[in-house]
Swiss-Prot record:
One annotated GO molecular function: holo-[acyl-carrier-protein] synthase activity
Record-level GO cellular component terms: cytoplasm
Record protein name field: Holo-[acyl-carrier-protein] synthase
Amino acids binding Mg(2+): 8, 57
Gene (UniProt): acpS
Enzyme class, broadest EC rank: transferase
Family: Belongs to the P-Pant transferase superfamily. AcpS family.
Annotated source species: Neisseria meningitidis serogroup C / serotype 2a (strain ATCC 700532 / DSM 15464 / FAM18)
Length: 125
């Protein structure tokens, strides 16, 4: 059963501006420790940041909380399965919160074009 859906669209120009203004502090605010290790090797660092920002915002919309409490940028991670499909991983506090809400699966789709990134999330009970 669908618990909620969320979508987010991010302008790459916005992420470029934020990254220039705040530098590593911006990445440190939105990326998990695991993502911070991957970030320097990303082929397109701005796209890497933008996709994760959009995915985490869409996640927060799908679960209905916004970014607050256990649903924080640093508790929501994005990785890929063996076939390259994007998937979420969670910090302990968020894992516990999802279990308490009865949310058993959260699916993610992301896409990017020249100047825009899109993330779409479906949370299921």
């Amino acid at each position: 059963m669908i618990y909620g859906i969320g979508t987010d669209i991010v302008s790459l120009k916005r992420i470029i501006r934020l990254n220039k203004k705040f530098g590593q502090a911006f990445a440190g605010r939105i990326l998990t420790p695991e993502e911070l290790l991957e970030f320097p090797q990303a082929g397109k660092p701005v796209n890497y940041l933008a996709k994760r920002f959009a995915a985490k915002e869409a996640f927060a919309k799908a679960v209905g909380t916004g970014i607050r409490g256990a649903v924080s940028f640093r508790n929501i991670g994005i990785g890929h399965d063996a076939l390259g499909k994007p998937e979420f991983f969670y910090g302990p506090a968020l894992s516990k919160w999802l279990e308490e809400q009865g949310i058993s699966r959260v699916s993610l789709s992301m896409s990017d074009e020249e100047d825009t990134v899109l993330a779409f999330v479906v949370a299921e009970k």
